[in-house]
Amino acid sequence: MTIEDRDDAHLITHALAKDTLSRLRDVETEQVAFRKGLVKLGRICGYEIIDGAMETEYVPVQTPLQETTGERVKGLDDVVIINVLRAATPFVEGLLKAFPRAKQGVISAGRDEEAGMTDDGEFPITIDYVKLPEIRPEDTVIVADPMLATGSTMCAVLDHVLDEADAFEDLFVLSAVSAPEGLVRVSESVPEADLLTVAIDDRLDDDGFILPGLGDAGDRAFRTV
């Protein structure tokens, strides 16, 4: 398992995850490569969740030559992935390669950039659309957003998820890059969530962007800059 437990989050340390993130950070990485990189990173993170949080069971297997015993991952039918539009779309595409039978939810959420960041480091959040599947007590819920900056968007999203879910097996908040400020805000607001990230960066700038970060993941993936 390549997940390192930190006080503020669980850090995914897989070599391919770090390699892919480094390419995503590079300003020279163009749109198609950036989008494919987010897909790849989502797939790697999905495999890490399977390896670190899911159990296996022994099953009989008939090979072409004889019967033997194999292992299957338990709970792959009991996964709910929440896509925080829009930047998470390619990230979630990768997660679905690891969890092809997962149910999907969608929440469209974004900062009110015109209002700006408050003195306590939060943004007003606008949520335009929410569509969630049934969340059952046996489900593993993964809320995916590649950037966890101030944590304002994620906290607003988690409010909706928790309103719909009376119980669940596990709740993961998954990001590619996180700021320390956002990790603290989310962990204090939703202590039952397990925070997973590939990198914990230095800080937020005065506009609430992660430094060094990788820029605006949505703009780079969808070429809206």
UniProtKB/Swiss-Prot annotation:
Provide the coiled-coil residue spans: none
- Tell me the domain of life: Archaea
Residues reported to bind uracil: 210, 215-217
Q: What is this protein called?
A: Uracil phosphoribosyltransferase
Give each disulfide bond as a residue pair. none
Q: List the source organism.
A: Halorubrum lacusprofundi (strain ATCC 49239 / DSM 5036 / JCM 8891 / ACAM 34)
- The residues listed in the UniProt record as binding GTP, with positions renumbered to this chain, are 36-40
Tell me the cofactors it needs. Answer: Mg(2+)
Q: What does it do?
A: Catalyzes the conversion of uracil and 5-phospho-alpha-D-ribose 1-diphosphate (PRPP) to UMP and diphosphate.
Quick one: which pathway? Pyrimidine metabolism; UMP biosynthesis via salvage pathway; UMP from uracil: step 1/1
Q: Which family does it belong to?
A: Belongs to the UPRTase family.
Regions that span the bilayer: none
A GO molecular-function term, please? uracil phosphoribosyltransferase activity
Instruction: Report residues binding 5-phospho-alpha-D-ribose 1-diphosphate.
Output: 86, 111, 145-153, 216
A Pfam family hit: UPRTase
Class of enzymatic activity (EC top level): transferase
User: Which keywords describe this protein according to UniProt?
Assistant: Allosteric enzyme, Glycosyltransferase, GTP-binding, Magnesium, Nucleotide-binding, Transferase
InterPro entries in UniProt: PRibTrfase_dom, PRTase-like, Upp_A, Ura_phspho_trans
Q: Corresponding gene? A: upp
Its activity is regulated as follows: Allosterically activated by GTP.
